[in-house]
């Protein structure tokens, strides 16, 4: 599937804003699955964007070969471990094996960081970038297939920047990568700056702000390439989900490295 954004071979140190309200839902080869892909790389299984399940749609049995994080913006998904509910983040890890069903129309804000495998006898559905057939066996049957996090109940932590609080959703411990996923609460009349130490991405959950004078609102993605100098202004407050692949340089510690 053709994405909206393709990362350059070397960082251009740019900041890109994508207004998903302006993007049409794109059908996949599997009925009932729709996407708005910001990034979509089938070779590496990398994805950033929105995924929509129509009511009654199943993902099919599959196994994650790395981290996938999904915020439930609307609806819910259920597998053998139970549901991931509205406004929770479901975290899949290397070896997560499950079949998820939507009992209601569901929208996910998703970031995939590795390919997903389906058993040879199974159908590959259109829900995952980098899907391929391979032998699938759950080698850790006592481990749940996902970690479900009620992110709004997490403690708020200071970031060292006045007007910005952090809720640490996932620190990637034990995954072999040193990334972070957080929620940032930005108070009205707040302004701050940082330099992205590595790829850093945001989804605007609510409120208004600007990134390098580019206005953003609810359901916008922001991609900050490595080395980008980023100026954030929020006169009215903003709530952000963020994924950082490395620590930023700046006055504080936004992402909890």
Residue ranges and their predicted role:
Residues 35-37, 48-52, 69, 89-91, ...:
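Conserved hydrophobic/aromatic beta-strand scaffold that supports enzyme active sites
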Residues 54-55, 64-79, 188-212:
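Glycine- and acidic-residue-biased ligand/ion/polar-headgroup-sensing regions
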Residues 57-60, 78-79, 86, 90-99, ...:
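Histidine-centered metal-chelating micro-motifs
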Residues 1-44, 121-176:
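A short, N-terminal "cap"/entry segment at the start of jelly-roll beta-barrel domains
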Residues 33, 83, 94-122, 198, ...:
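Ligand-binding loop in jelly-roll beta-barrel domains
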Residues 169, 184, 216, 222, ...:
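Fold-core signature of tandem repeat domains
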């Amino acid at each position: 599937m053709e994405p909206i954004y393709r990362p350059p071979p070397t960082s251009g140190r740019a900041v890109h804003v994508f207004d998903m309200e302006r993007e049409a839902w794109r059908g996949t080869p599997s009925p009932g699955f729709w996407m708005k892909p910001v990034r979509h790389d089938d070779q590496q299984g990398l994805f950033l964007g929105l995924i929509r399940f129509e009511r009654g749609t199943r993902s099919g049995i599959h196994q994650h070969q790395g981290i996938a994080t999904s915020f439930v913006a609307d609806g819910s998904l259920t597998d053998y471990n139970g549901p991931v509910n509205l406004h929770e983040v479901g975290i899949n890890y290397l070896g997560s094996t499950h079949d998820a069903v939507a009992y209601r129309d569901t929208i996910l804000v998703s970031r995939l960081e590795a390919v997903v495998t389906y058993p040879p006898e199974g159908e590959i559905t259109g829900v995952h970038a980098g899907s391929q057939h391979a032998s699938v066996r759950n080698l850790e049957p006592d481990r749940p297939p996902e970690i479900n996090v009620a992110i709004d109940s997490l403690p708020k932590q200071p970031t060292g920047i006045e007007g910005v609080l952090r809720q640490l959703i996932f620190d990637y411990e034990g995954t072999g990568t040193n990334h972070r996923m957080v929620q940032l609460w930005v108070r009205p009349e707040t302004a701050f700056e940082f330099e992205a130490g590595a790829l850093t991405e945001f989804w605007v959950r609510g409120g208004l702000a600007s990134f390098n004078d580019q206005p953003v609102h609810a359901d916008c993605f922001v991609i900050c390439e490595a080395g980008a100098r980023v100026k954030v202004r929020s006169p009215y407050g903003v709530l952000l989900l963020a994924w950082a692949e490395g620590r930023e340089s700046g006055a504080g510690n936004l992402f909890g490295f």
